[in-house]
Amino acid sequence: LVWQSSSLAADAPMAAGTVKTSRGTAQIERQGAKLPADVGSAVKVNDRITTGADGAVGITLRDNTLLSAGPNSTLDLNKFAFNTTTHAGELNASVKRGTLAVVSGKIAKTSPENVSFNTPTISLGVRGTEFVIDAGKGVE
């Protein structure tokens, strides 16, 4: 029984990042559950991060990418993989509505072709280090 529970822990997906700042209404939607996006909360692949009219959330991914979602924003973390030794990896996120400020991390420096962000109307590849995405009211 002890072996089985440790096996389950090993199968749990590693966090892609951590909530570093949070204010107002901000939550993480994970597998149908709505969790508060409190400072220190894990952010995982397939999570949806949402903020209300008074909300904002700052996330640091494991490769040191910084994501800052403004009020009335919806962000889906579609893909994230990062090798801490080679700094190779992949990052894809969708900004469904609102704004997202990004300061790219190690993946974008090592493999910029593997970093992309989508909005309801456009797909963006990363070639710089800092940018802001404004998806407006977006489409859910």
Regions found by a protein language model. Name each.
Residues 7-140:
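Flexible, surface-exposed loop/linker segments and immediately adjacent secondary-structure boundaries
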